[in-house]
Amino acid sequence: MAKMGKYGLGFKWAPEFPWMLPNASEKLGNPERSEEDGFCPSAAQEPKVKGKTLVNHVRVDCSRLPALECCVQSAIIRDIFVDEDPQKVEASTMMALQFGSAVLVKPSKRLSVQAWAKLGVLPKTPAMGLFKRFCLCNTRECVCDAHVAFQLFTVQPDGVCLGNGRFIGWFVPVTAIPEYAKQWLQPWSILLRKGGNKGSVTSGHSRRAVTMPVYDFNATDVVYADENQDDDADDPVVLVADTQEEDGVAKEQVDSADSEICVAHTVGQEMTEPDAVGSQTPIASAEETEVGEACDREGIAEVKATVCADALDACPDQVEAFDIEKVEDSILSELQTELNAPADKTYEDVLAFDAIYSETLSAFYAVPSDETHFKVCGFYSPAIERTNCWLRSTLIVMQSLPLEFKDLGMQKLWLSYKAGYDQCFVDKLVKSAPKSIILPQGGYVADFAYFFLSQCSFKVHANWRCLKCGMELKLQGLDAVFFYGDVVSHMCKCSFKAYF
């Protein structure tokens, strides 16, 4: 059986529309926190966020059942029936979210799923539960470490949950709740991610300073320590991670560095501080005057400067770092020019191809302003635009099917459209379609076709009979549409390839 917990839906922002990534990992050890693999999970955002947030998301209309009296709410939850198959439960919930018929049923009290299981307040069948999670961001590109994510996981009738987090309620289709509870439904809406990069579009996501490198540690915590602390280290630079214990060690190293004298090491020889330091530096006492103390400080400073200068002179192996770009060498310049030539040529070719492609695309999709439709193979279609391919293809195919709209007004407009194109029918059909299907850059062909078929009725019949065993199959309505007027091969239960 597939692990249903691998499929979750993020609210209010989901990484993909309409279902979440299947590779999201759940950390069952700590139900309040979890880590996601390499991407920032869904974050709860308010609609007041500006920028590309509203561009990359679509608002989906649904409903919710508020928390009623304890006994009434418990009775409604016990009467919820979605489907006995967990996979069908997920599919029906996803379809309900797409067409705005999903309902959020919140319990009367804020308890865990295990607590409600002990009380016996659970749906009759598996249902999708809404959970609140605090997810860590491992991309190192966010100014915040954790995000709030609302995700869906399957809850079994015996109280076994295939997800984790703080339980909020059940998300079920409107057909799963009893009829008497539909009078208390309230309109509600959620925002789902349409596309773009994986992760959420938050105010601090993928934002960092221009000069900040991508390191596993903070650049401000880098300190330089004495080589005497580690004789086996090749590099005297010590990288201190951003932890509380190591921060204390770093502070002690910095404090001690101000009071120590710079000491350098050479190969096979170790320089020590001369004895003149002790002789030239008198011991300070409480009876000395301020003038004497000032002279002593000046003497100590001169000795330190002399020792540091001698140490630097005694290290002939040290070479000052230089920038290779500032080196004046004709060979290096020629080599750099030869290496950059292919890249420059490729960049110029890409620019030329982009210009030609844009010009060709504009010429292909250029439509006269007075042209509103065209006719192909006896079927009418709206004028060609860059973002209405889903509309044109669906309308052309539907004209060949024997369908009738359930609404009498739409049926009259449909007959007018088939007779000689009617723009009123197109406008009314597009306006009645769910907003989750129609996008600014286009639409979903399969979802729009399914919505179109759901608005129609079919007076079609198809009979199927096996030529070997004689078993018959009678199809009606939408099932018969897919076989109407065609000779389609079909495999019978007796393993015989029969025909209509």
Swiss-Prot record:
Q: Which Pfam families match?
A: B-CoV_A_NSP1, Peptidase_C16
Keywords assigned by UniProt, alphabetized = Decay of host mRNAs by virus, Eukaryotic host gene expression shutoff by virus, Eukaryotic host translation shutoff by virus, Host gene expression shutoff by virus, Host mRNA suppression by virus, Host-virus interaction, Hydrolase, Metal-binding, Methyltransferase, Protease, RNA-binding, Thiol protease, Transferase, Zinc, Zinc-finger
Kindly provide the name given to this protein in its UniProt entry.
Replicase polyprotein 1ab
Gene3D superfamilies per the record?
Answer: 1.10.8.1190
User: What's a Gene Ontology MF term here?
Assistant: zinc ion binding
In UniProt terms, what function does this protein have? The replicase polyprotein of coronaviruses is a multifunctional protein: it contains the activities necessary for the transcription of negative stranded RNA, leader RNA, subgenomic mRNAs and progeny virion RNA as well as proteinases responsible for the cleavage of the polyprotein into functional products.
Q: Where are the zinc fingers (C4-type)?
A: 466-494
What cystine linkages occur within this chain?
Answer: none
Q: Does the keyword RNA-binding apply?
A: yes
- Write out the catalytic residues in the record: 389 (for pl1-pro activity)
Q: Which gene encodes it?
A: rep
User: Where do the Peptidase C16 domain residues begin and end?
Assistant: 352-500
